[in-house]
A protein has these predicted regions:
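Accessory helical-bundle/CTD segments and flexible terminal tails appended to RecA-like ATPase motors
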Residues: 40-41, 53-99, 104, 108-253
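Cys/His-rich short segments
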Residues: 1-39
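Residue-level detector of alpha-helical recognition elements and their boundaries
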Residues: 18, 30, 52, 120-121
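Short, charged N-terminal beta->alpha structural module
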Residues: 23-52, 169-175
Length: 253
């Protein structure tokens, strides 16, 4: 595997326990979980709430509710107990903000518990688990900011994602460096190849926001005009050769 931001490969990547390099499914899915619980608790009602089976509310009758992230129904009187599964798998997602996202998801689920009801986070330790257990989410957010600042990762800096042909992305990066000469030399990550071209990231201070975004906007317009301009004896080039997104909360790596 390699970093989707800078392209650095994880050399010698193996499982720390069995030393295997093969991947396997780490979650069985909500329906299978519900089926297993139904067999373990044969006389208990089991309700599945997910994207395919939306459930908004459940009554106060005894039941096991198996819900995926964000699909948790509101229980009348609150849940008598909440068990958060697959936490270790969720934290392994290919997302720079996955830890804070997990804390938000788990906190939202825990808030559905009845007063005094236990909430169990299975298989997770460390700062995220402590923040949930002590309900100190603001302190965790401050810790995350402190760790991201020296790495120049959002939201301590702003980020622009550029996708397009190699030439279009390279030209846009050159124009940004000219427009903002004080831009940090390590501000640009990439370009790296993608399925339909290349991708690069530009990390910049909030104070440089106006200049950087103006330069990128001008590059998008210039590239659009260039790709549509007919050349004598040839057909126009492909459209949408440069796409720029700024401050995207969840960049699709």
């Amino acid at each position: 595997p390699e970093c989707a931001w800078c392209g650095r490969a994880a050399a010698g990547w193996t499982c720390p326990h069995c030393e295997s390099t093969k991947l396997r499914m780490s979650s069985s899915g909500s329906e299978r979980t519900a089926d297993e619980l139904g067999r373990a608790f044969a006389d208990t009602r089991v309700i599945v709430a997910d994207g395919e089976h939306p459930v908004l509310r459940v009554d106060a009758r005894p039941a096991l509710v198996v819900a995926t992230r964000g699909a948790e129904p509101i229980a009348e009187g609150g849940y008598r107990a909440i068990v958060l599964l697959d936490g270790d798998r969720m934290l392994q997602a290919d997302d720079l903000r996955i830890a804070e996202s997990c804390l938000r998801w788990w906190s939202n689920a825990a808030a559905l518990a009845a007063p005094g009801a236990p909430v169990h986070l299975v298989g997770v330790a460390g700062p995220v688990a402590r923040a949930l257990a002590t309900w100190t989410q603001p302190a965790y957010a401050r810790l995350e900011l402190a760790e991201r600042a020296p790495l120049r990762m959002p939201p301590t800096v702003r980020v622009a994602a550029l996708n397009g042909t190699h030439g279009a992305v390279s030209n846009a990066l050159d124009e940004v460096r000219v427009a903002v000469p004080t831009l940090d030399p390590a501000a640009v990550l990439g370009p790296l190849p993608t399925e339909d071209g290349v991708r690069a990231f530009v990390r910049f201070e909030y104070a440089h926001g106006t200049a950087v975004t103006a330069s990128l906007r001008a590059s998008v317009v210039a590239e659009a005009l260039r790709s549509r301009r007919a050349v004598k004896g040839r057909t126009p080039g492909p459209r949408n050769t440069l796409r720029v997104r700024v401050d995207v909360p969840d960049l699709d790596l």
